[in-house]
Amino acid sequence: MPPLLPLRLCRLWPRNPPSRLLGAAAGQRSRPSTYYELLGVHPGASTEEVKRAFFSKSKELHPDRDPGNPSLHSRFVELSEAYRVLSREQSRRSYDDQLRSGSPPKSPRTTVHDKSAHQTHSSWTPPNAQYWSQFHSVRPQGPQLRQQQHKQNKQVLGYCLLLMLAGMGLHYIAFRKVKQMHLNFMDEKDRIITAFYNEARARARANRGILQQERQRLGQRQPPPSEPTQGPEIVPRGAGP
């Protein structure tokens, strides 16, 4: 009879140690019950405050910090769900109405479990897709998206090269056109100057001929100069025949 007493005591002793049960209970009590508690903001926080709190928490709970810790992934998904609800005005108003009406909304953990179950039955999604879905301008980079982005980059590069070649061609054509216009202008100017010079030279020749004719005419009208008359010779005295 006495030897059976320790066996009965072992059967009555709980399988889980009290410390483990207390830790689990404390973990359940410490787990946030609302999205505001999960993000660490008050219910009257602005959208910018919610965004800053999400960024701060996401750095701490991102799965890439400790890939071997599965709890980080679930907590990060809960955080993303809380940010998705509280960052949009309509969903946040509906969530606040549920809190005020007394009908308890789904806790972050329940919502995450429901979404996880739905995702297991649906098609596979890349990791951190829910995290990247919070931002409209950023998307997860899968192999197909990278190939598509690479193809788009090639197209943009081709368009840039075509524009550059077209610009060089237009620049060359414009340069040739301006050069031709300048040559035509200089030729026209040279033609005008040459014509003016030839006309002035012809006038000078004509004026020279007229002057020569006038001189000849004036020379014919004037009489030749008369010789001076000699007076009577004076014979000196003593000179006789």
From Swiss-Prot:
State the residue spans of region: Disordered: 88-129, 212-241
Compositional bias, Polar residues, is annotated for 119-129
Q: Where are the transmembrane segments?
A: 156-175
Q: Where is the composition biased (Basic and acidic residues)?
A: 88-99
Q: Does the keyword Membrane apply?
A: yes
Q: Which domain of life is it from?
A: Eukaryota
Task: Name any Gene Ontology BP term.
Answer: response to unfolded protein
Name of the gene this protein is made from: DNAJC4
Q: Under what name is this protein listed? A: DnaJ homolog subfamily C member 4
What membrane topology is given? Single-pass membrane protein
Q: Where does the secretion signal sit in this chain?
A: none
Major place of residence: membrane
Question: Where is the protein localized?
Answer: Membrane
A GO CC term attached to the entry: membrane
The UniProt entry, under Pfam families, shows: DnaJ
MF (Gene Ontology): unfolded protein binding
Entry keywords, A to Z: Chaperone, Membrane, Transmembrane, Transmembrane helix
Domain J as annotated: residue spans: 34-99
